[in-house]
A protein has these predicted regions:
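Glycine-rich anion/phosphate-binding loops
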Residues: 1-6
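Glycine-/charge-enriched secondary-structure boundary and capping motifs
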Residues: 42, 49, 53-58, 62-78, ...
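Glycine-rich anion-binding loops of enzyme active sites
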Residues: 18-115, 229-232
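Glycine-rich tight-turn/loop motif centered on a GG-T
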Residues: 28-37, 125-135
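Gly-rich Lys/Arg/Thr-decorated short loops/hinges at beta-loop-alpha junctions or inter-strand turns
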Residues: 76, 116-133
């Protein structure tokens, strides 16, 4: 479900309506009961999400026996999502911050938790905990309302919260644009690490021009989704209120050199 929902969220954040999917399903030896169970449950979850989001499966493939003598790979469903932008010139959207002083909003109802996150894996070397909870009804509502806001011209940037959580989402928006931000996450409940790195589903970060803030928030609230202001676009660094700051030049260097560093 999460793989399908995140793919659709990405398409919505580009200004497009999700239309259909293809898939590549990668697993270990299906004759092992635990592997076959994960495959069966993945198919069921994918079907539930596709029916809810009205995105039929146009095709795909399955790859089994991805393992070595010690263990199989993690269950890995890969989703390719097709979307349609009605008017590319008017409605196309990107995740990059656009303008100084733009308002930064978090859309969605965060369910705080660190289970299965990149934070646990990278920082603590742990692969544990429950996967993030996904409510498909909430997911559909968030996607529909955000897409309406984008096509209405109320949004200047949109990026879904996924791997790495909210902090990584905001960092990417700054890295892609080299525009900084003043961020105050105290409006969200939970510990600092949970707020920053929880991979709670159905979350999207939007920006808008200051004179559009009231109209955008009104649209989102009337659409039945939660929204809170978490900052403004400004400067050349990401400044987290009460925590510290990091320059975008530093983040950009890390981002651009990540693959060469791993491969060297």
């Amino acid at each position: 479900q999460i793989a399908v929902a995140e793919s659709a969220r990405n398409v919505v954040c580009s200004g497009a309506k999700p239309m259909a999917i293809t898939n590549c399903l990668n697993y270990g030896n299906p004759y092992k009961p635990e592997v076959y169970w994960t495959f069966k449950e993945s198919l069921a979850g994918m079907g539930d999400a596709c029916r809810k989001l009205n995105t039929p499966v146009t095709g795909g493939n399955v790859s089994f026996y991805n393992e070595n003598p010690e263990c199989a790979i993690f269950p890995t469903p890969i989703i390719g999502m097709l979307g349609v932008i009605e008017d590319v010139e008017k409605h196309k959207m990107s995740p990059s911050f656009k303008n100084e002083d733009d308002i930064i909003l978090y859309v969605g109802s965060p369910r705080i938790g660190l289970g299965g996150t990149e934070y646990l894996k990278v920082i603590h070397g742990l692969t544990t905990g429950d996967a993030p909870l996904l409510d498909l009804d909430v997911e559909l509502k968030v996607q529909q309302v955000v897409l309406q806001a984008i096509t209405s011209g109320l949004v200047t940037a949109a990026h879904d919260v996924s791997d790495g959580g909210l902090a990584v989402c905001i960092a990417e928006m700054g890295i892609f644009s080299l525009l900084g931000a003043q961020i105050d996450l105290s409006v969200l409940s939970g510990s600092v690490h949970e707020i920053w790195f929880s991979e709670a589903q159905s979350g999207i970060v939007l920006t808008c021009q200051p004179n559009q803030k009231e109209a955008l928030i009104k649209h989102l609230v009337q659409g039945g989704v939660e929204v809170v202001q978490i900052g403004t676009v400004q400067g050349d660094a990401l400044m987290f209120e009460g925590v510290g700051s990091v320059s975008l030049d530093h983040l950009h260097s890390i981002y651009e050199n990540a693959i060469p560093k791993v491969m060297s």
